[in-house]
Amino acid sequence: MENNNNNNKNDNEINFKKIEINETLESGKFIESKIDMKLGELIIKVQSPMCFSFHKHLVNQFCFNCFSNSHEINNAKFNKFKVDINKNYIIRCNNCKLIYFCSDECFEKVMSIESFQDSTSTNIHTPLECLILSNYHDQTISPKINTLHDQTENRMIINYLSKIAYSTNNNNKFKLLLIEMNQLIGDFNNDNNNQTLSLNEIKNIKNKSFNLRKLFNNFFFNIDKVIIEELYAKSQRNSFGLWKNSDECFGLSMYGNQTIYNNNNDKDDNISISYFNHSCFPNCVRVQENQSISIYSLIPIKKGDELSISYIDIRMSKNDRLLHLKEIYYFECKCKRCTLPPLSNLSLEIEKTIENYTCKNQSIKCTGILYLPPFNKIQRICNFCHWKEPINN
């Protein structure tokens, strides 16, 4: 056991000792580089989300275990749970009929008793989640505001609550999940946070939390409405879209912390990937690889620099960027690109750099970002469509 732990620490040291959390009154918490970084350096990788949900009209297209597009890799032939949908054999949970898999192996990893008892895997379709989804209706939780985002967010919260309900049954993996979520920032009842949200948004969260609590109470899991309100606030601050490509978002997710080790392989800090702040001129890029999320450096980064990613399409105009960030993420962007005079030399240089690392794949007019992965120093790769461009371009 000691050898395994040491191996894990060494892996984490390689990937994570290069960053740390800093905090200021103006910016709040952010991630800062502890070392000089090269172009294309892997900064952090989180293997799987704490909770997630797919858009309801796409649940039969993506594997609940590996997030693969199940319509592309249907290869299950002898599973009693497979069903014929549009002449494609797909494995699913036959109780709620809302959880699908690409293979027998993925089915077993999520649905088997052995997986539930496994000490590490938290990607489990619990009996409680199955019951809730079988009796769940979007209009019940969000009767007035019922957008696709709301529906997916509700199901993501259900996914999380359905797992921590088992944290009292001597199940350490779900207790750790609870601890990780508690470390994320929501602050729904914080006065400053509620000044950011409109009265309608606050009312919507309160109504959804009340209705969701009532639904769980029907199955004897009693949870305080305030806890659910905080989960919705955390979702607004910490959730990531699940993207098939630059135009197709298929779900929503929240990722927990990664442990950082110092040079002596001692625990140094816990860092959440959600602490990467937004910039319209980012120095890092987010890459989704099935369940995992990786952050790579887009440009050389100096020690002490804040690390940032873009939450939006960086090709948008300044006015569109500001409006989108205000409406969706509830903040006014004050990054260098948004505050510089538009015709200044530095502003023009930034726009030239942005143009250089945006995807050039004209066949689908992709809005992704080209990055240089550590395993390939010859070609840059788009973080969305995976289009490749020779580095000498």
Curated annotation (Swiss-Prot):
Keywords: Methyltransferase, S-adenosyl-L-methionine, Transferase. InterPro entries: H3K4_H4K5_MeTrfase (IPR050869), SET_dom (IPR001214), SET_dom_sf (IPR046341). SUPFAM superfamilies: SET domain. Pfam families: SET. It comes from the Eukaryota. GO terms for molecular function: methyltransferase activity. Gene3D superfamilies: 1.10.220.160, 6.10.140.2220, SET domain. Its EC number is 2.1.1.-. Residues 17-312 form the SET domain. One of its GO terms (biological process) is methylation. One of its GO terms (cellular component) is nucleus. Probable methyltransferase. Belongs to the class V-like SAM-binding methyltransferase superfamily. This is SET domain-containing protein DDB_G0283443. The lineage of its organism: Eukaryota, Amoebozoa, Evosea, Eumycetozoa, Dictyostelia.
